[in-house]
Amino acid sequence: MRTLWILAVLLVGVEGSLVQFETMIMKLAKRSGFFWYSFYGCYCGWGGHGLPQDPTDRCCFVHDCCYGKVTNCNPKTATYSYTEENDGIVCGGDDPCKKQVCECDRVAAMCFRDNKDTYDGDKYWKLPPQKCQEDPEPC
């Protein structure tokens, strides 16, 4: 019960595109981004250091790089417009910054979908920080 309460408190603080990103991951990869990717590898979750450990972790690395290139809005809180069409996501709206955030999230969600078979939770879930000490590659 305590775990559910803590999870509820954490989710209350999440807003904007992070909730939308979770929805995209659910739509495209058919799994929860929060539960599957929040503590995976060196780049999935908050922050990111070292080298991506596998193709799934690379999805998170590329997503972090994409967010780093966003200007004129906060990518973690900006709410954007998108539609679900067939089996995909189409980003819309007139705000270039919000559209860029949407594209970052869309590409990452597709990457998770396309790399589901590389996910190795036994090896990379809650990876110790000392495993992520290499010099990072440039975005």
Curated annotation (Swiss-Prot):
Enzyme class name: hydrolase
InterPro entries for the chain: PLipase_A2, PLipase_A2_Asp_AS, PLipase_A2_dom, PLipase_A2_dom_sf, PLipase_A2_His_AS
The protein's required cofactors: Ca(2+)
Pfam families: Phospholip_A2_1 (PF00068)
Major location (coarse): secreted
Assembly information from the UniProt record: Homodimer.
Family to which the UniProt record says this protein belongs: Belongs to the phospholipase A2 family. Group II subfamily. D49 sub-subfamily.
Biological function: Snake venom phospholipase A2 (PLA2) that inhibits ADP-induced platelet aggregation. PLA2 catalyzes the calcium-dependent hydrolysis of the 2-acyl groups in 3-sn-phosphoglycerides.
Name of the protein described by the UniProt record: Acidic phospholipase A2 S1E6-c
Organism: Calloselasma rhodostoma
